[in-house]
C-alpha cells in the first residue's frame, strides 16, 4: 500500500506539488492525470526517492519515505516512458540480470527471472540481442521487465506506453492488469485518457500542483456533471493547459 499526506514540493518560488494527499491499495491501479507541468512527474519522483519533499509525508509498505529511503526504494519499480534507459552494449538478458544482481538476486536467480519475464513479455527470441539493435517497443518491454525483476510491491509508471505501436501497447496494458491481479500497488501517469479509463480503478487529477479531483470514473463524472473522463479533465485542468 502507498499513502501520501499533504506531500509538497517547491522549487524556490514554484509550487510544483502542493499538499497532495491520497492512498492506493494493493491490487489497485491509480491513474494520475494532469496537463504538462501539473506536478505528475514531480510527485512520482518524490515517491521514487529521486526528489526530497519540501513538506508532508508519504509511506510505502508502511515505510516512511523520508526516514527509510533505501528500504522504500527496494519496494518500488519505476518506469519512465520516452527513454527505456537500457545499456545499449548489453544484451536484453544482460540488462535484466545486471539490475537483478544490483537488487540482491543471485546469478542463478537473476538468470531464471530474465527467462520468465522474457516469456511473459514475448521477447524470448531477442534475449541475446544487443539492446541498441532492438525496436522501441521491444526495448520498452525489456525496461518494464527490468523494473519488476526484484518483485516490487509498488509500481510507478510515467507515460510507459509513449511511442509504442498498438501491439506493444496492448502487451504492456495486459501485463499491468496481471500485476494488479497479483496484488501490486500501481500508479499510472499517462496523457492517454482512453488508457486511463480502461485500466484505472480510481483517478486523481492534478492542476497547477494541487489535487483537484479524486474518485472512480463514475464518481468524477457524476460530481462534475460530465459524460466522460475527457470532459471532466478539460473542465478541471483547463483545455488550454495541454
Regions found by a protein language model. Give the residues of each.
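Catalytic Walker B motif of ABC-type/P-loop ATPase nucleotide-binding domains
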Residues: 155-158
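ABC ATPase "signature
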Residues: 214-215
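A short, surface-exposed alpha-helical micro-motif characterized by mixed small hydrophobic
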Residues: 196-198
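Conserved ABC ATPase "signature" region
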Residues: 97, 101, 108-126
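Conserved ABC ATPase signature
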Residues: 130-134
Amino acid at each position: 500500500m502507498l499513502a501520501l499526506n499533504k506531500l509538497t514540493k517547491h522549487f524556490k518560488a514554484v509550487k510544483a506539488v502542493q499538499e497532495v494527499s491520497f492512498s492506493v491499495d494493493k491490487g489497485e491501479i491509480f491513474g494520475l492525470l494532469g496537463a504538462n507541468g501539473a506536478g505528475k512527474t514531480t510527485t512520482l519522483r518524490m515517491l521514487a526517492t529521486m526528489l526530497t519533499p519540501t513538506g508532508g509525508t508519504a509511506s510505502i509498505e508502511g515505510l516512511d519515505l523520508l526516514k527509510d529511503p533505501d528500504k522504500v526504494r527496494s519496494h518500488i519499480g519505476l518506469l519512465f516512458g520516452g527513454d527505456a534507459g537500457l545499456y545499449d552494449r548489453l544484451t536484453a538478458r544482460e540488462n535484466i540480470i545486471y539490475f537483478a544482481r544490483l537488487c540482491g538476486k543471485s546469478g542463478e536467480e537473476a538468470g531464471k527471472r530474465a527467462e520468465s519475464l522474457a516469456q511473459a513479455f514475448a521477447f524470448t527470441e531477442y534475449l541475446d540481442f544487443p539492446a541498441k539493435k532492438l525496436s522501441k517497443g521491444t526495448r520498452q518491454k525489456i525496461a518494464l521487465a527490468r523494473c519488476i525483476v526484484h518483485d516490487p510491491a509498488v509500481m510507478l509508471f510515467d507515460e510507459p506506453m509513449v511511442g509504442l505501436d498498438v501491439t506493444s501497447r496492448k502487451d504492456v496494458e495486459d501485463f499491468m492488469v496481471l500485476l494488479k491481479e497479483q496484488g501490486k500497488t500501481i500508479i499510472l501517469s499517462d496523457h492517454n485518457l482512453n488508457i486511463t479509463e480502461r485500466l484505472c480503478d480510481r483517478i486523481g487529477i492534478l492542476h497547477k500542483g494541487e489535487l483537484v479531483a479524486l474518485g472512480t470514473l463514475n464518481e468524477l463524472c457524476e460530481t462534475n456533471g460530465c459524460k466522460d473522463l475527457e470532459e471532466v479533465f478539460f473542465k478541471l485542468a483547463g483545455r488550454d493547459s495541454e
